Amino acid sequence: MSKIEPHAARIRAFRADQNGTAAIEFAIIAPVLFFTLLSLVELGVLGMMTSALDNAVVEVSRRIRTGGADAATSASSFEDQICDRMGGAITGCRDRLTISVQKFSAFSSAGAAASAPPAGQFDKGGANDIVLVKADYRWPLMTPFVATAYNRDGPLEVTIAARAAFKNEPFQ
């Protein structure tokens, strides 16, 4: 018997032992799996926030459209109403929300202005005026993968935009 045979027998026994292989495979796959799950959850929350902002803008804009927004309605109270309808549990909503309410003479000019970010104007117009309500909400992201999907190189946040264009009713 040579000196190599006992070592070769131990090496063969070591290679034949399959204990712990699943743990090693899981350790390799786990970070990718958890990162993917976190990204999916974040995309779901982002979709929910987009829907919440759209619905809040439509609901609050209805008060302008029907003449229910009195002269005391200001940009800050309008922001408060949007934040309340988005869900009161969102902290810092007012700091992350930017709105703009503008009146136009034609829908074509309102459509051209819809792509620009809100600049803070607040002119709800009068009866039969065409009004464009713009709201942008800066949503913080948790995963850089989602930020990359939105082509963001800077801070981990994405801007959720909601627009509502309408003609005011002939209110008094």
Describe each PLM feature range.
Residues 1-84:
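Alpha-helical assembly-interface signal, strongest on the long, hydrophobic N-terminal helix that forms
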Residues 2-3, 59-172:
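Short, conserved structural patches
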